[in-house]
């Protein structure tokens, strides 16, 4: 059965979202049709507003509605450390943790030569420029995902930064709480041992 054109367009629009297949998109489209008119208008306004009002902070690449994000404009943050993350959602997760009070730098991706993503396509050049302009930074913490792309990006950034004499560290990666050593892969075990702390 063919849906009326407006419904078909809405289904296609929902399918552009990650993880949304045709069945889920169809359900969402019919749910949207059943929503009160005011809710649909609020929803569409929110979509338009996020595209119009949200941009990248020119300093760190975080998302913000202000000229400079709240983290970069906060003088109470530790100005000596910059934590490098892949996406703004990673920054948000680390902020929710409440343990880190330094600065951030958001790459908006990782190096992936197979996908045609090189250093120019991610926010690496601005990180290096930022470090060259700021003598206060003593440590860069690489907090990228433990994927092959994340690993290669970390290595690439580390090689660029180390000659400047800035300390480069990475988040400790290892065994999850409650996991069995026998089921862990060798990379996880190696990192767990190398990242050990004295009790």
Swiss-Prot record:
This is Recombination protein RecR. PANTHER family: RECOMBINATION PROTEIN RECR. May play a role in DNA repair. It seems to be involved in an RecBC-independent recombinational process of DNA repair. It may act with RecF and RecO. SMART domains: TOPRIM. Residues 80-176 form the Toprim domain. One of its GO terms (biological process) is DNA recombination. Keywords: DNA damage, DNA recombination, DNA repair, Metal-binding, Zinc, Zinc-finger. A zinc finger (C4-type) spans 57-72.
